[in-house]
Regions:
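Alpha-helical transmembrane segments and their immediate interhelical/interface regions
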Residues: 1-28, 187-196
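Transmembrane alpha-helical segments and their boundary/interface "anchor" motifs
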Residues: 2-4, 18-79, 90-91, 181-182, ...
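Alpha-helical transmembrane segments and terminal signal-anchor/GPI-anchor hydrophobic tails
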Residues: 151-160, 167-273
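Alpha-helical transmembrane segments of multipass membrane proteins
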Residues: 42, 46, 50, 109, ...
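Specific transmembrane alpha-helix
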Residues: 2-15, 104-118, 138-174, 198-220, ...
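Hydrophobic alpha-helical segments with transmembrane-like composition
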Residues: 5, 14, 35, 46-58, ...
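Membrane-interfacial loop-to-transmembrane alpha-helix junctions, especially the N-terminal start
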Residues: 23-31, 125-132, 173-182
Length: 286
């Protein structure tokens, strides 16, 4: 899902097709309220809830394997950037709210959009074959690239992929609509050669084409209402931010042996029901 999110973010950032210092500063200001502020508030909320839980449950830690009361000033800062560097933590290089690594990387990419625009604007004036070959070559080469906390090569490439359509003022749905099966077969081929980012590119084409066809069919049938309940649409970001708390509760219940699967069927049911529980509780709290 994350490559698609970066793709859409790039398309929206450059939706005007133009770029200027004033527009750049305006977009950064808007994203300070839509990305940075929620980012800080949610991570601070998680820190508060974890400190309360650690006070209630002695010798208990979650997400970070170090008691919050033992945090140094650096540890507190790392919670907002990369918890893998807190003590012997290791693991994924993400902030305390682990899914927020996407927001962190997106904010960093937004800072570099003047450079991204210059490169893509140059490519937009070249033959389209050059842009296509360069993009696929970079996606293939990215399998050997080292990601830095806050700067994802995958994120940068798919953000640029979406941005390219906006800068060139081409509707990507018009380009991708007839490529449904081509995108799927390409994704399968990329999966077979173990190149995840090329696979994601194919899946984006397949998903956009399929979704466009479904919506067009609904429009022809005069079913213009969006097929998802409004409550799910309105709570999307809250579910994205909150579901890790519910997941932590489920994992704690399993680790403490409160719920123990006795066979493979029960384990499978727990696996299937967990995301349903996370969604239901998150939407309910919202």
């Amino acid at each position: 899902a994350n490559p698609f999110f970066f793709f859409i973010s790039g398309s929206l950032f450059f939706k005007e097709g133009l770029f200027s210092k004033e527009l750049y500063l305006h977009k950064l200001q808007r994203r300070a309220f839509s990305l940075l502020l929620p980012y800080i508030l949610w991570i601070s909320t998680y820190l508060f809830l974890l400190s309360v839980a650690e006070g209630i449950l002695p010798n208990w830690t979650a997400i970070v394997h170090k008691p919050i009361e033992s945090f140094s000033f650096t540890d507190w800062l790392l919670c907002f950037w990369d918890i893998s560097k807190i003590g012997p933590q290791g693991g994924i290089a993400a902030p305390l709210v682990i899914p927020f690594w996407y927001i962190r990387d997106l904010m960093v990419i937004c800072l570099f959009t003047p450079i991204i625009y210059k490169v893509l604007h140059w490519l937009a004036n070249e033959r389209k074959e050059i842009s296509i070959l360069l993009f696929f070559a970079l996606l293939y080469a990215s399998r050997w690239a080292e990601n830095l906390p806050g700067l994802s090569v995958q994120g940068l490439l798919f953000f640029s992929f979406g941005a390219f359509f906006s800068i060139k003022q081409i509707k990507f749905i018009d380009v991708m609509r007839p490529l449904k099966w081509g995108g799927l077969f390409f994704a399968i081929f990329a999966w077979q050669i173990n190149c995840a980012n090329l696979m994601y590119a194919g899946l984006i084409v397949f998903t956009v084409s399929t979704t466009t066809r479904i919506l067009e069919r609904r429009k022809q049938q005069n079913k213009l209402a969006f097929p998802l309940p409004l409550v799910l649409i309105n709570s999307t970001f809250f579910v994205f931010a909150f579901h890790s708390i519910v997941l932590g509760g489920i994992l704690t219940i399993l680790k403490r042996g409160i719920v123990v699967p006795h066979n493979e069927l029960e384990a499978f049911l727990i696996y299937i029901l967990s995301p349903v529980i996370m969604l239901t509780v998150s939407v309910g709290v919202h």
